[in-house]
Amino acid sequence: MLNFLNICSKTRKSWVLLIFTVVILELIALYLQHIVLIKPCVLCVYQRCALCGIGIAGLIGTIAPFTPLRFFSIPIWIYSAWKGLLLAKEYTDIQLHPSPFFMCDLFVQFPHWLPLNKWWPSMFDADGDCAEYKWYFLSLEISQWMLIIFANYLIIAILVSLSQIIDLKKWNNK
């Protein structure tokens, strides 16, 4: 399996597939926000940013998948998936174990040099409540789905990373 993942990581199609999954998830988020009229909370917006990080990793991998440039994309992928997983876990905990004393941030906080909520407010501005149940699909809430999605992204990224290490060992033994 690791050999298969190593071979896939050297093809442009697999990196485009990674970007495609991110685009689909972002489009679903925008559909839920603008068509179904579910207001995103701060944690939702931060999870969108984590998805964008995975998309950027896919873009870097797509540029030159057969060169060592892909080694730069894998840590970005792992970091973004990990941060997304932590955010989704926090969001799920808020919804499964509500506290009357908890209140999520009212505004997203981006660095002053990257004010995404000002550049693209329809995507990165939050005005929803984290503790509010918003939407169910197959008996799971959005936060629970995102927990599953980010866990899968992280597992695949770690396996792809391991496949690169194994490939390097084969290269050094020749």
UniProtKB/Swiss-Prot annotation:
Domain of life according to the entry: Bacteria
Ranges per topology, Periplasmic: 32-49, 90-144
Source species taxonomy: Bacteria, Pseudomonadati, Pseudomonadota, Gammaproteobacteria, Enterobacterales
Family (UniProt): Belongs to the DsbB family.
NCBIfam families per the UniProt record, alphabetical: PRK01749.1
Chief location bin: membrane
Keywords: Cell inner membrane, Cell membrane, Chaperone, Disulfide bond, Electron transport, Membrane, Oxidoreductase, Redox-active center, Transmembrane, Transmembrane helix, Transport
Gene encoding the protein: dsbB
Molecular function, one GO term: protein-disulfide reductase activity
SUPFAM superfamilies, A to Z: DsbB-like
Subcellular location per the Swiss-Prot or TrEMBL entry: Cell inner membrane
Official protein name in the record: Disulfide bond formation protein B
Topology term for the membrane: Multi-pass membrane protein
Biological role stated in the UniProt entry: Required for disulfide bond formation in some periplasmic proteins. Acts by oxidizing the DsbA protein.
Annotated S-S bridges: 41-44, 104-130
Transmembrane spans: 15-31, 50-65, 72-89, 145-163
GO (cellular component) term, any one: plasma membrane
Cytoplasmic compartment segments: 1-14, 66-71, 164-174
Pfam families cross-referenced by the UniProt entry: DsbB
A Gene Ontology biological process term: protein folding
